[in-house]
């Protein structure tokens, strides 16, 4: 039976076009034909119920054809070392043991509202083959390769100027590749609502999450409006990764949201912000004749060698006077630390988290054990430890010292 959408729409149009059309379908006394019709209607009902359950039908119909998605997949995730490392960062791993890598989950989620030809992936050039293996649906020309790690401002600039060359009327949704989302439909609804807002309002939109703790590893967004019922507000201040004292103050004030690293803007507006606040970067990338041509790889290699390591938060979001925030409510974690990993995972009766049934914990509490699946491990009489092994690196670290993990990754990287 053909259940493709065009066939179903054609069938529905026949049903709703009147009695005469229905009489042409339903033939009195023809039991075999009528059974086929009934079967098709039943299949149709179940098919439409499945679509409506996913909630994607209305979103797809309303999606602006000028909208693009940029998935940022160039980070190393060294706060999650050794499970996330330079050879295989966490976005390419199935860290939560759900059967799919983070980037695969991100693609499957966002591709419900964006066609493949309007999804771009930006990553380090050494990860191109991994992207092609894990996301074979994405055209090769939509994989943007960074020569050097230069943080989010250069990567967003690269994508913005490239997409502008393809479509000067474009809107871009920029998302991380390695975040956990518990409610896909609420997430997609917020993306659509943000796009609709930016189509009417000049400016930059970010999505904020209500904080659950005083976290120093996230950016904080202070909203101008104190009306909690308002979904979108203008941003008063934008602070990237505050110290603990400031984080405590932000958390206690109820005026701040976490920055989820999800941005929505028109290509014209973000390029104007680069001109205003990061003119050096604008000058480097404003050579559109070399983007979307065979000269692009050599051009990007030259440009990235001159780029500074700057985040979009510090380079633009903290400085711009045209920033808005949409309060998201879709269950979010960047899974960037072992603390965040512990919060997401199922625990045993002693608040321990492990990834394997070959790990035995006895008289131990509040531990995290993440080891290769065939590794037999016994943990006896210890509390609050992180025990993690991957690629011949074994780390045993007290959970209160988690902020030192980046040093370990750096030490072994330079030791080589």
Tell me what each language-model feature is.
Residues 50, 63-66, 267-416:
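Left-handed beta-helix
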Residues 8-15, 35:
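Hydrophobic, low-acid, alpha-helix-prone terminal segments
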Residues 21-24, 28:
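Intrinsic low-complexity, disordered N-terminal segments enriched in polar/charged/small residues
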Residues 103, 159, 178, 221, ...:
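Residue-level signal for inorganic ion chemistry
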Residues 16, 23, 33, 39-40, ...:
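Polybasic, lysine-rich low-complexity intrinsically disordered segments
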């Amino acid at each position: 039976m053909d259940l493709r959408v065009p066939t179903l729409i054609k069938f529905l149009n026949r049903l709703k076009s009147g009695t005469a059309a229905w009489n042409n379908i339903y033939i009195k006394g023809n039991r075999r034909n009528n059974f086929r019709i009934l079967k098709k209607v039943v299949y149709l009902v179940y098919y439409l119920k499945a679509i409506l359950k996913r909630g994607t039908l209305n979103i797809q119909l309303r999606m602006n054809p000028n909208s693009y998605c940029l998935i940022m997949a160039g980070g190393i995730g060294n706060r999650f070392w050794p499970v996330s490392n330079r050879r295989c960062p966490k976005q390419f791993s199935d860290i939560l043991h759900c059967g799919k890598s983070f980037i695969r989950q991100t693609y499957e989620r966002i591709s419900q509202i964006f066609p493949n030809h309007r999804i771009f992936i930006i990553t380090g050039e050494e990860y191109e083959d991994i992207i092609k293996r894990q996301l074979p649906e994405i055209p090769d020309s939509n994989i943007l390769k960074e020569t050097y790690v230069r943080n989010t401002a250069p990567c967003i600039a690269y994508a913005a100027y490239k997409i502008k060359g393809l479509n000067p009327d474009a809107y871009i949704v920029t998302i991380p590749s390695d975040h956990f989302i518990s409610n896909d439909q609420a997430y997609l609804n917020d993306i659509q609502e943000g796009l609709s807002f930016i189509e009417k309002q000049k400016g930059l939109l970010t999505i904020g999450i209500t904080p659950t703790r005083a976290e120093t590893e996230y950016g904080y967004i202070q909203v101008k409006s104190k009306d909690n019922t308002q979904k979108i507000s203008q941003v008063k201040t934008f602070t990237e990764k505050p110290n603990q004292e400031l984080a405590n103050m932000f958390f206690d004030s109820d005026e701040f949201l976490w920055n989820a690293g999800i941005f929505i803007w028109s290509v014209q507006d973000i390029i104007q912000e680069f001109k205003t606040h990061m003119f050096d970067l604008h000058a480097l990338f404003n050579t559109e004749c070399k983007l979307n041509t065979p000269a692009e790889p050599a051009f990007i290699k030259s440009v990235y060698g001159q780029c500074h390591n700057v985040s979009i938060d510090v380079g633009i979001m903290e400085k711009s006077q045209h920033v808005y925030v949409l309060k998201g409510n879709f269950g979010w974690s960047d899974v960037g630390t072992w603390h965040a990993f512990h919060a997401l995972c199922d625990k045993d009766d002693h608040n321990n988290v492990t990834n394997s049934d070959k790990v035995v914990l006895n008289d131990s509490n509040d531990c995290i054990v993440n080891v290769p699946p065939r590794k037999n491990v016994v943990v006896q009489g210890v509390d609050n430890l992180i025990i993690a092994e991957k690629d011949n690196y074994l780390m045993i670290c007290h959970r209160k010292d988690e902020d030192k993990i980046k040093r370990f990754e750096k030490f072994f990287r330079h030791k080589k």
